[in-house]
């Protein structure tokens, strides 16, 4: 993984593209901290949306993540959910900048394409707004190595009784990615 250094406002910021899935993303986070001494990580990207009526056109800030993957259990004690410790800092920043967002539970799974209607219904009933493949594992590694993790998403596809491509692919998704990169840069300058 290539790691890039940017100096802005007298601060050094490192960037890298995290791989998909908690094991790969978590291993890279662990190695980046060991190699660079970085103590704070901002992670952002797309997610599947379980509650489009709540999440439409808003940044999603996970407050807890359902641990439907095996990776996180190697780093922190077993529990259904892991607290996303940086969520308050992200929410406070977005609120101060008047950037629309919603905060709530998330679902991390490592079973790609297995967001079945029954699983979706269960997670929605527990208050999950989104689903993705890294957050719980990354938080577990961050907790284990003593790093601070700040996470936020933008809605990609929409999962429910049927699948909707939503904002996946194309110019709209690229624009969202660039917008979130700018938010991450500004957030990094303040933490």
What would you call each of these model-derived segments?
Residues 89-97, 141, 183-191:
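Generic non-transmembrane alpha-helical segments
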Residues 136-172:
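Zn-dependent metallopeptidase/amidohydrolase metal-coordination segment
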Residues 68-70, 114-116, 158-163:
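Short acidic/His/Gly/Ser-rich catalytic and metal-binding motifs that mark active-site loops
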């Amino acid at each position: 993984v290539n790691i890039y250094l940017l100096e802005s406002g007298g601060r050094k910021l490192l960037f890298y593209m995290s791989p998909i899935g908690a094991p790969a993303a978590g291993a890279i986070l662990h190695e980046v901290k060991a190699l660079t001494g970085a103590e704070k990580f901002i992670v952002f990207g797309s997610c599947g949306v379980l509650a489009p009526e709540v999440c439409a056109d808003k940044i999603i800030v996970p407050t807890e993540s359902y641990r439907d993957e095996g990776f996180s259990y190697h780093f922190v004690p077993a529990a259904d959910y892991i607290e996303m410790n940086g969520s308050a800092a992200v929410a406070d920043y977005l609120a101060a900048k008047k950037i629309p967002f919603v905060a709530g539970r998330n679902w991390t799974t490592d079973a790609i394409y297995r967001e079945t209607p029954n699983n979706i219904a269960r997670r929605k009933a527990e208050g999950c707004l989104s689903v993705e493949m890294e957050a719980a594992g990354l938080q577990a590694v961050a907790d284990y190595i003593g790093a601070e993790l700040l996470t936020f998403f933008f809605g990609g596809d929409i999962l429910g009784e049927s699948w909707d491509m939503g904002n996946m692919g194309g110019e709209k998704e690229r624009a969202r990615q660039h917008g979130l990169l700018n938010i991450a840069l500004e957030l990094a300058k303040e933490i």
